[in-house]
């Protein structure tokens, strides 16, 4: 196991300073979402070039910091067809970018049924779950071609909000290139806090062999 840090949890700096700063804090790997860590330009399909990937890879090599996860936090169940097409292309760009970067995992969350990507009760419906499975399947298929793992992170406010639903997604898509980012705090809400131990135990029971990354944090 290697302990890393999310790049956007470190004080902002340009990449040529950010990555050395991460190493200086004692970390040897990071979870980076380009849209959260690059402010000099807008990361997108057009700017996520092989050259940029190689530049970041060289910075990482020089500073002995691996990219453990490339974050892509976009809503695969956006109901707007045009925006959904754009989102799919961005996922594909992240997968290609990760393969050049030498990053094995593209991490994501599981979306909402609205354009605003916010909680509403319909996120927890069976229809929402099926929408997510249907829209995730071609993304995972694309990742298989590049040898990249797509890791989904269950979050209570989103479509995959329990460990049981996460297991359903894994079983439905049935690919070694689909795994889990497990953040136990993100599965909690005011209504289930008293069951936190049981929820964590159930997560390891149902998901253990498919967990690629664990997020650790305190909460209030």
What positions do the PLM features span?
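Short, acidic/polar
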Residues: 11-23, 85-95, 193-205
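Boundary/entry segment of secreted carbohydrate-active catalytic domains
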Residues: 1-13
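Transmembrane beta-strand segments of Gram-negative outer membrane beta-barrel proteins
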Residues: 1-3, 65-68, 88
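Active-site acidic/histidine proton-transfer and metal-coordination neighborhood
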Residues: 16-17, 54-63, 77-182
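Glycine-rich, proline-tolerant flexible connector loops at the mouths of alpha/beta enzymes
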Residues: 31-57, 110-117
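Acidic/histidine-rich catalytic cores of soluble enzymes
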Residues: 2-5, 30, 36, 70, ...
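Catalytic domains of carbohydrate-active enzymes, especially glycoside hydrolases
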Residues: 15-36, 100-105
């Amino acid at each position: 196991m290697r302990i890393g840090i999310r790049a956007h949890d470190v004080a902002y700096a340009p990449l040529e300073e950010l990555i050395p700063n991460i190493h200086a804090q004692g970390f040897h790997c990071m979870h980076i979402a380009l849209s959260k860590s690059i402010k000099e330009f807008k990361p997108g399909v057009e700017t996520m070039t092989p050259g940029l990937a190689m530049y970041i890879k060289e910075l990482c090599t020089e500073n002995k910091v691996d990219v453990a996860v490339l974050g892509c936090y976009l809503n695969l169940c956006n109901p707007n067809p045009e925006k959904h097409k754009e989102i799919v292309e961005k996922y594909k760009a992240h997968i290609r970018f990760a393969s050049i970067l030498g990053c094995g995992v593209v991490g994501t969350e599981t979306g909402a049924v609205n354009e605003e990507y916010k909680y509403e009760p319909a996120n927890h419906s069976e229809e929402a779950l099926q929408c997510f499975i249907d829209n995730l399947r071609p993304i995972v298929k694309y990742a298989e071609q590049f040898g990249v793992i797509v890791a989904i992170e269950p979050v209570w406010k989103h479509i995959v909000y329990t460990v049981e639903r996460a297991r359903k997604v894994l079983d439905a898509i049935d690919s070694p290139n689909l795994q889990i980012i497990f953040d136990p705090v993100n599965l909690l809400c005011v209504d289930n806090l008293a069951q936190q131990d049981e929820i964590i135990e159930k997560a390891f029971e149902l998901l253990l062999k498919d967990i690629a990354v664990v997020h650790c944090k305190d909460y209030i």
